[in-house]
Amino acid sequence: MLLPQPLIHGRLVSRYKRFFADLVLDDGQEITAHCPNPGAMLGVKDAGQGAWVSWSDDPKRKLAYTLQMVEQGNALVGINTLLPNKLVAEALAADALPELSGYATIKPEVKYAEASRVDFLLTHPDRPPCWLEVKNCHFSRTPGLAEFPDCKAQRSTRHLEDLSAQVREGHRAVVLFVVQREDCETFSACAELDPAFAAGLEAAAKAGVEVLVYACEMGTQAVRIARRILWSHAHLTAI
């Protein structure tokens, strides 16, 4: 997927009120950018970190700049939580995810359960429907290990329960973690920061929900879902 061009490099000054980030661009300009990530952003919000923003000339926008990526060590980390669904939609349309290939229709944002919407519903006349939930993952504090979540994620835990209910109805249900970085080979639920989610993921898997984790190929011009990585059930690290 091509990113808004051109991405502009700078350094973070602060991220605040969830959706705002102050930066100093390489040309010395001080800006405030929209931060499309309501989470804790552990490891990718520190003053002085290199960052990449996009610029828009849309007059309806309050902020012309959007924070897209942050540099953590040698890794380029995508922080835009809106991007994974777009990446998955692109991959599904291209039949690029072998575990999710061969469906006749792909419907985004389908209402189900009492008050939930699933990210994608995949259907085929000869198969049970497949309910697909997508989760963004950027968090890594141990070399090679991606973790989710980086804060309490009650809504995500509820999504796992909803997916389990679909399995009980005879449907297929999948949770797909999209890791927006290249430097991770394994994935684990972060039990230290959200034990309820970690337990919920294990319970969902036992109930028949499929867990997929894909890492991205990151660049300042394009990002794409690139390769599947291992879900490590018992890999727990101290905070």
UniProtKB/Swiss-Prot annotation:
Alphabetical list of PANTHER family matching this protein: SUGAR FERMENTATION STIMULATION PROTEIN A
GO terms, molecular function: DNA binding
Organism: Caulobacter vibrioides (strain NA1000 / CB15N) (Caulobacter crescentus)
Protein name per UniProt: Sugar fermentation stimulation protein homolog
Family as reported in the entry's similarity comment: Belongs to the SfsA family.
Entry-linked InterPro entries: SfsA, SfsA_C, SfsA_N
Gene3D superfamilies assigned: 2.40.50.580, 3.40.1350.60
